[in-house]
Structures are given as C-alpha cells and as structure tokens.
Amino acid sequence: MPSFLVPSLVSSPVLLKLLFSPGPKTIWSLWQQPMLFQEATAFENMTKDWNYLEGSQKDCYRDTMLDSYENTVPQGSFLQLSMMPQRAGNDPPGVSNASEMEMEISNMREKFLMSVTKLVESKSYNSKVFSKEKYFQTIKEVKEAKEKGKKSSRDYRRAAKYDVISVQGTEKLIEATHGERDRIRYYVHKEELFDILHDTHLSIGHGGRTRMLKELQGKYGNVTKEVIVLYLTLCKQCHQKNPVPKRGLAPKPMTFKDIDSTCQVEILDMQSSADGEFKFILYYQDHSTKFIILRPLRTKQAHEVVSVLLDIFTILGTPSVLDSDSGVEFTNQVVHELNELWPDLKIVSGKYHPGQSQGSLEGASRDVKNMISTWMQSNHSCHWAKGLRFMQMVRNQAFDVSLQQSPFEAMFGYKAKFGLYSSNLPRETVATLQTEEELEIAEEQLENSLWIRQEERAEIGADRSDMDDDMDPTPEASEPSTSQGTSGLLCW
C-alpha cells in the first residue's frame, strides 16, 4: 500500500496540503510549516511514492486521501476552553480582539488564494475553479452562443452546461437549469471562494469537509472537495483542538415503541465561568432525532428546570421517558413536578445506568463548553448565555451520519432556513435588500431571467434538432412507408 494511504501518515493537514500543491516538494520546504520531525520524515516517504504514480493513478488516490483527511478536521470541531490563552485587559479567555481577528482572516484569505491558484495551475487537476477573468469571459461566451444564429458544437456545449441570469444589474453564471427553476446552482470565481467557505465553515460550527460539502453543493456548482480541504488546512481553531471521542448520549436505536420517545436532560455546571446570574446550563436532547435545546439557568433547582421543560414540551411535544445522569433523586423530582403541574401529562423516569452516568454527563459538558468557547471568540463576547440559542442552531443543522440528515431535518422534516440567504438569490443581492418591495423586484427579475433562459434553451434544442436533420445523409426516398408494414422499419 502506498505510504500516503496509511491513515497514520495522513493525519497532518500540512502533508495533504503540500502533496496537492504543484512544484518541487523538498524536505527543506517542510521547515516552513508547523509539523513534527516524524511528519516531515513521513512526508519525504510519501513524496517518493507519489512521484512514481501516473496522472490517472494520482487522481484515483486523491479521493481516498481526502476521505482519510475527514478525521483530521473532525465534524463540529470546537476549540476547548482549557486550550485558550489567557489575555490581558478586559478581554475574556478565548476572545480575540477585532483587529487581530481581521488580520488573521486577511492572512487566511491571502494564503488560500495562493493555494487555489497553485491548485488550478497544476496539470494533474481538472479545474472547475474559474479565475475572475475566465469567469466573465465564460459569461460573455455563453451569451454570444445563445445569440448566434448558426451555432457550432462548442456553442451548443456552452449553452447546455451554463446559463446567465441578471439580478439587479448583476450578471451571474449558473448551472443550466433545464426547466428546474426552483433549483439554482451558481458558479463562482476563485476570488469569491474564501468568503463563501469561511462563512459556511463558521455557520456550521467549524464543521469538516463532508458537512461543508453538504451545505455548499446545493447552491454552488464548482465548490469542490479540494478547495474545501485547502481552506480547512488554514483554520487554526480546528487544528489546535485535540480530537476527542464522540459522546454517546443517545441509546442505541431500537424498533419503534414508546420507549423510543425519550428525552435526555442534563444540568451543566458553569459556576467557574458564570455569566452574571446564570451559573448552569440545561442541556436537552431528543433521543430519536438528536435535536438539542440549550437554556441558561440561575440555579439547578427542580422548579426552574421544570419551567424550562414545560416551554420545550408545549412547542415540540412531550416524550414518554425523561432520562438524566444528574442523579436519580433529581430526575424523580423533576418528573413528579411535571406531572403535578400538567395533570394531562404522564411521563416516567428513565432507567439508572450505573457507571455510565459520569461519562455521559462529562461528554455533554465538554461539547457545550467547546461550543461556548468558539462562539465567544467569534463574537468577541464573554456573555455565553446570549449565545446558547445560536450554538443550539449550529449543532441542530449539522449533518449527522447515523441519521443521514441533520437533527433539525429529523425533527421538522425540512432543512433549516436562514432567511433570504437560504433563497435562490445571489449573496450580493441579498446583502443589499432592505424592504419587501425590493425583495419582490429582485425575485421578479430572477424569475424573468430564468424564463428567458428556458425559452432560449428550447430554441437551442430546436436548432440542434434541425441541424441534426440537415446532417442526416439518408435520402428522403429511402424513408420507410407505413403501408409496407414493420419489415421495412429502420432502427436508430
């Protein structure tokens, strides 16, 4: 087996990044990178194996290497509170000031653009990524191809692959819709890629390659696995975090019965980093969908917990079993008060799991504190109580492998929406909209543009059919007559 396919040797994102970069790769260049000596030695061996491969073999192995990389940036990577440096002044731990964050993002953007440029220039990479010049040149060629009276084969290929739409005076290159006006996939040039990847990465809680690809492939036609990996190699927060085992709060799936209607309730202790009067967090998880709810608590008294649970139950519905690792006495008291306050509700306590409780509670606490740290740093705030709802949304919209969908989809039956940024309108158009009237105008322009493209496509299809008929060498006299039966029919 080639050395670069051994999982232990592809654990460093630096190795993958250098292998994907064109040009000579010497051991000297590695000392420019933050890697260990063992990694540098591994890279030298990997490079030797890599150079022996043909171009087609490299393409074949590339996907395998990218799959191995999935473990390098774990899904939902979050920086642990304990790993954040202490800062001087009034900034809380883990909260960078705005100027430092802007400088870091600027450096990331510059490095990403350089890496993408090298990737595109690599002869072994069949690029879907446009330079800015190529992007606008393609728009021009697509428009010219549609306007030509007599079209070449290249014109037909262009028209079959791309469409151009105009919204508020801005022309955008999109994937040919073929009549599917409810699904638009945009093409972007490399100068636009970083902001799209960065915003998506943050919005899904520093999610890995698979989650980012799931988020982006529905709206963009040329955001590839390779460019996502290049971006992820630059995210310091993801690589500073030590991979931790996934916690298993939810029991193993069983055939459906009432016991499946279970919720998990934990009280997480935040007294060491209290946010004003809030010193605890209520962690709620639905067993079957893994949907979570986070709420700040002033105390861990049962009556305060019950008040929050009633809000949850009257919105999402009530489970049959309430499970908790916060103690049998606490669980029984909460269940008793729920049944007292809501006589029509009948809910029972979950089974006690000796030996498992502490690990499960610690897992939930670690997960939430990691999310809090990331949110505090991104928002320059130490008021974690205000951010719990946003952290909850990030976790619930993340793709879950065991569910094969996000917890939000499992709970509600559709994907989470974020206002107009979930619409088919271009991002830059959405950013300028202020009123419903402006939204209606933009949607009408998009609709009209799609209708025009659909009519043009129908005309091009008719022209292509006519051209095929003109090129048909079969004489008209040889066409079979229907009166001669089926024996004279020709098969095409």
UniProtKB/Swiss-Prot annotation:
Biased composition (Polar residues): 479-492
Coiled-coil stretches: 427-457
Species of the source: Homo sapiens
Record PTM Phosphothreonine, positions in chain: 117
KRAB domain ranges (all copies): 36-117
Region of interest (Disordered), ranges: 455-492
Official protein name in the record: KRAB-A domain-containing protein 2
Entry's Gene Ontology BP terms: DNA integration; regulation of DNA-templated transcription
Keywords, in A-Z order: Coiled coil, Phosphoprotein
InterPro entries: Integrase_cat-core, KRAB, KRAB_dom_sf, Retrovirus_Pol_polyprotein, RNaseH-like_sf, RNaseH_sf
GO molecular function: nucleic acid binding
Cited PANTHER family: PROTEIN CBG26694 (PTHR37984), PROTEIN NYNRIN-LIKE (PTHR37984:SF5)
Residue ranges annotated for the Integrase catalytic domain, each copy included: 247-415
Compositional bias segments (type: Basic and acidic residues): 455-465
